[in-house]
Amino acid sequence: MILKSSIDRLLQTIDIVEVISSYVDLRKSGSNYMACCPFHEERSASFSVNQVKGFYYCFGCGASGDSIKFVMAFEKLSFVEALEKLAHRFNIALEYDKGVYYDHKEDYHLLEMVSSLYQEELFNAPFFLNYLQKRGLSMESIKAFKLGLCTNKIDYGIENKGLNKDKLIELGVLGKSDKEDKTYLRFLDRIMFPIYSPSAQVVGFGGRTLKEKAAKYINSPQNKLFDKSSLLYGYHLAKEHIYKQKQVIVTEGYLDVILLHQAGFKNAIATLGTALTPSHLPLLKKGDPEILLSYDGDKAGRNAAYKASLMLAKEQRKGGVILFENNLDPADMIANHQIETLKNWLSRPIAFIEFVLRHMAGSYLLDDPLEKDKALKEMLGFLKNFSLLLQNEYKPLIATLLQAPLHVLGIREPVSFQPFYPKTEKPNRPQKFAHVSSMPSLEFLEKLVIRYLLEDRSLLDLAVGYIHSGVFLHKKQEFDALCQEKLDDPKLVALLLDANLPLKKGGFEKELRLLILRYFERQLKEIPKSPLSFSEKMIFLKRARQAIMKLKQGELVAI
């Protein structure tokens, strides 16, 4: 039999919208998703899916249930078959037991009772309450996250309420002495942070001591309910906000989460003192949010951010990394009323791929040519995980970080373009650009270049040697669709049918050159305002000025 805890974990981890949308076409409608019911014939949509609560309901035929029941009904599978199919699809390990089919209601109830005892103790301990308030926590936050305190009185509370001690040992609330047949409080003299499953059941605890010599934080030991490699602190309170905002902030500490929620960042969660692991991904991916890693800027924080970014980059997740330097962290910034500064920092993450490349470059002594060569091989090896389009996007960054020639990375260096002229025509010097006032608008120019590429696909090989999608401000999606050969994209079809785009024989190179010129002119304005270091800014500015000069002389220059 499959353990009940294993089934609960699967349901808490998978996204019902992702499950059902692979069978029927779901459309967003308010806070829910709607579709025509797959279980009876209808013309208007009456089948509703609630992503937050994880269930579906049809107002027409009354069909309802969770992800497992949907797969059972749609594919005509047994309960176990549907479970195993979902577990295989989402890479979730199921636990089996040959004996009794366990129901963990008693376990959840016990942990909830213990959590209540901890809460009562905290409100009778002014010293510990004062500590939390000095850290910036309000009473409302302390109550919302149900913080508590473990004192010797908890033993009396357990006895008084007749709680099952053997169960509490299994669940990690109590420990048992090896030498004496006695139990002891595992979290004695610690501030208690109850840890919840995504469905808001207490499954364990984290405990913080104020003593100097003891381990600052300890968690419940691994058990049938508590798996710290897949749980996320605060997720049960954050999940609805994550779905609505399409963004999740991952921090390193319990206090960070509580203070972020208190300051209005209610989409914040934390790992349980562990690195981000593949086991966290199913939960993090629910609702397809942008993932922001909010880590300390010390060596440990940078290394943790690097490992997490490697994983998230390969998963091609949206988001990035924010490192807090100079011993700052979100909790300190909120306590010091620097909320606007924090908002600004969180709005400027470093994309995962870029962060990985910068970290790799920083791991080598780049003054040594052999070290630089090793760095280049590692960075290019990492980029091989991605499409050619993404590789071309990031190769110029590698060139900048390593101060390496572009051709080493397979990027075409600036060259003079030699146009083809029929023998009947006299070759003229490449035409220089007229004054800016006579130039077409950037949007029109972008349309024109893409139209040329649609009309003559052989030009695309030439184009990608010089430009990438970052050149386009208005038509980036169209260029990406073209590179991915999505020729039935409605926006590409519209460009192909646009009668207001005058194409001239042999005119593509001139328009491409003009588009690249406009890009480098923007760079001259944007680079000084960028977060790059001074030396990096100087490198980019010098290259932009040189490129503009060559473009105005009629040469094609690679970006």
UniProtKB/Swiss-Prot annotation:
- EC identifiers of the protein: 2.7.7.101
Reactions catalysed, semicolon-separated, are: ssDNA + n NTP = ssDNA/pppN(pN)n-1 hybrid + (n-1) diphosphate
Work out whether the entry's keyword set contains Zinc-finger.
yes
Give the transmembrane region(s).
none
Zn finger residue spans: CHC2-type: 37-61
Please provide the record's keywords in A-Z order. Answer: DNA replication, DNA-binding, DNA-directed RNA polymerase, Magnesium, Metal-binding, Nucleotidyltransferase, Primosome, Transcription, Transferase, Zinc, Zinc-finger
The protein's enzyme class? transferase
Q: Name one GO biological process term.
A: DNA replication, synthesis of primer
The record lists Mg(2+) 2 as bound by D296, D298
Q: Quick check: keyword Ligase in the entry?
A: no
Matching NCBIfam families, A to Z? Answer: dnaG (TIGR01391)
Record's function text:
RNA polymerase that catalyzes the synthesis of short RNA molecules used as primers for DNA polymerase during DNA replication.
Q: What is known of its domains?
A: Contains an N-terminal zinc-binding domain, a central core domain that contains the primase activity, and a C-terminal DnaB-binding domain.
UniProt protein name: DNA primase
Q: Which source organism does the UniProt entry give?
A: Helicobacter pylori (strain J99 / ATCC 700824)
- Its gene is dnaG
